[in-house]
Amino acid sequence: MSTSKTVKDYIRTIVDFPHEGIMFRDVTTLFADPRGFRMAVDQMLHPYAGQRIDKVVGLEARGFILGGAIAHQLGTGFVPVRKKGKLPGATISQEYKLEYGEAVVELHKDAIQPGEKILVVDDLLATGGTAGAGIKLIEKLGGEIISCSFIIDLPELGGRKHLQSLGMDVHVLCEFEGL
């Protein structure tokens, strides 16, 4: 029997955070462990070996950690998708729905050039709202999305299906049941 750890083994679950009934999947324990972090980055990169990727787009906030590491490994640029009002300079914005209300994310107008090949990354895929908004921003600037890569998928929330309905290839390292 193998005792090798998987990416999922490095992720801590915190019960009833931030609200009662929520099982928070905490990737900071994965990021803090050098073996776990390297494993996650390597596995997120593996499906794209040999493909042209011009930029990695990371979704706020843990997507910045992953995106920076992945862009470094690829030798490409990194571009953040941020919450409204956090980026200086000229931006474009996209609204998306939350459970109760709406939110807005932004991208610099000059961050992506038409025809650039983009990999979108984040730690967790829930409903796909943030990722879907980021995808729309990239497409507005003419970027071509190669894939969206996540550490965790919460399949009950339907994010993967949502992104696939937008024509996206979706890669995840592990799934957790429950909210």
UniProtKB/Swiss-Prot annotation:
Pfam families: Pribosyltran
Listed PROSITE patterns: PUR_PYR_PR_TRANSFER
SUPFAM superfamilies assigned to the protein according to its UniProt record, in alphabetical order: PRTase-like (SSF53271)
GO molecular function: adenine binding; adenine phosphoribosyltransferase activity; AMP binding
Gene3D superfamilies attached to this UniProt entry: 3.40.50.2020
Assigned keywords, A-Z: Cytoplasm, Glycosyltransferase, Purine salvage, Transferase
Record pathway: Purine metabolism; AMP biosynthesis via salvage pathway; AMP from adenine: step 1/1
InterPro entries from the UniProt entry: Ade_phspho_trans, PRibTrfase_dom, PRTase-like, UPRTase/APRTase
Superkingdom classification of source: Bacteria
EC assignment: 2.4.2.7
Reactions that this protein is recorded to catalyse: AMP + diphosphate = 5-phospho-alpha-D-ribose 1-diphosphate + adenine
Subcellular location: Cytoplasm
First-listed, main subcellular location of the protein, grouped into a coarse class: cytoplasm
GO biological process, one term: adenine salvage
A Gene Ontology term for the protein's cellular component: cytoplasm
Family annotation (NCBIfam families): apt (TIGR01090), PRK02304.1-3 (NF002634), PRK02304.1-5 (NF002636)
Task of the protein: Catalyzes a salvage reaction resulting in the formation of AMP, that is energically less costly than de novo synthesis.
Family in the record: Belongs to the purine/pyrimidine phosphoribosyltransferase family.
Oligomeric form and interacting partners: Homodimer.
Protein name: Adenine phosphoribosyltransferase
